[in-house]
C-alpha cells in the first residue's frame, strides 16, 4: 500500500536524489539522466505534486540529513545503513527490474506508514536475448529499457508499493511485469506493456491517470 513521506519532505514537494559513482561512471549514466528528466516531465504534466532534484550528499546513515533517495546499482547481496540500522537487499544483476527499499516509520506489523528514506538499486548489467530463433545471443539491454526501469523505481520512491502496480488492462510505466523485447540493435529494445490489437510498447514512457491519482494522493499540490 502507498505511504506518504515525512511531513518535511512532503511539504517541500521535492525528493533529493543522490547518485552513486557506480551509476555516474558506468553503463547506467545515460539512462539515469534520461529517467530523471522523464520523471520530472511526467510529474509536471500530471501534476504529481513532487519532482526530483539532485543531492550532493548521500542519506545520513544515522539520521534525517542528506539525500532523501539513494540511487545505486546492485549485483547480489547489497547492504546499506539508514537511521542507525543495517539493511540488506538481494539484486540479481542481470534481471530486468530494480528494487526500491523504503525506510520509515511503521505500524508495528511490518507496514511502513511514513517514508523517511528510499534506496534504489538497479541491476548492474541487465541482459536480453537477441537475434533470430536458434541463433540468439545474450547481450546488455539498451538505454530505453534501462530508462523504463529507472522511472518505474522513481515512482516507487514517490511512495507507491508493489501492491500499487498497474494492472494489465491499464498499461503504463508502473506495470508490474512488462515484457522486454529485443531490437535489431540495443537502441531499439523496448518493453511490451500490452499484447493486443494494437500492442502497446514503451518507449514512449507514459503514466496512467490511475497511477497519477495514487501519487497525487500522497503529495499536496504545490502552488
Language model feature labels by segment:
Residues 1-27, 36, 41, 92-111, ...:
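Disordered inhibitory propeptide/activation segment of secreted metzincin zinc metalloprotease zymogens
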Residues 11-18, 68-70, 118, 189-191:
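Hydrophobic beta-strand segments of well-ordered beta-sheets in folded domains
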Residues 14, 47-51, 192:
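Residues at or immediately flanking beta-strands
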Residues 17, 39, 120-122, 171, ...:
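Bulky hydrophobic/aromatic "packing anchor" residues in well-ordered structure
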Residues 17-28, 129-141, 199-205:
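Second-shell loop/turn segments in exported
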Residues 29-180:
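Metzincin-family zinc-dependent endopeptidase catalytic domain
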Residues 184-201:
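Short helix/strand-capping connector loops at secondary-structure junctions
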Amino acid at each position: 500500500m502507498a505511504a506518504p513521506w515525512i511531513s518535511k519532505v512532503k511539504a517541500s514537494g521535492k525528493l533529493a536524489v543522490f547518485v552513486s559513482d557506480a551509476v555516474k561512471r558506468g553503463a547506467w549514466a545515460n539512462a539515469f539522466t534520461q529517467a530523471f528528466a522523464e520523471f520530472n516531465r511526467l510529474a509536471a504534466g500530471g501534476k504529481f505534486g513532487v519532482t526530483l532534484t539532485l543531492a550532493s550528499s548521500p542519506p545520513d546513515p544515522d539520521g534525517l540529513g542528506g539525500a532523501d533517495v539513494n540511487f545505486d546499482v546492485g549485483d547480489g547481496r547489497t547492504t546499506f545503513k539508514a537511521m542507525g540500522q543495517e539493511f540488506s537487499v538481494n539484486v540479481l544483476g542481470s534481471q530486468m527490474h530494480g528494487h526500491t527499499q523504503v525506510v520509515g516509520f511503521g505500524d508495528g506489523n511490518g507496514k511502513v506508514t511514513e517514508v523517511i528514506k528510499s534506496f534504489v538499486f538497479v541491476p548492474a548489467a541487465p541482459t536480453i536475448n537477441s537475434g533470430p530463433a536458434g541463433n540468439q545471443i545474450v547481450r546488455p539491454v539498451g538505454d530505453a529499457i534501462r530508462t523504463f526501469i529507472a522511472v518505474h523505481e522513481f515512482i516507487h520512491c514517490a511512495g507507491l508499493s508493489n501492491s500499487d502496480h498497474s494492472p494489465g488492462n491499464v498499461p503504463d510505466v508502473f506495470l508490474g511485469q512488462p515484457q522486454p523485447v529485443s531490437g535489431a540493435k540495443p537502441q531499439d529494445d523496448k518493453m511490451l506493456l500490452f499484447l493486443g490489437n494494437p500492442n502497446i510498447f514503451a518507449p514512449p514512457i507514459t503514466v496512467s491517470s490511475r497511477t497519477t491519482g495514487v501519487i497525487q494522493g500522497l503529495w499536496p499540490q504545490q502552488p
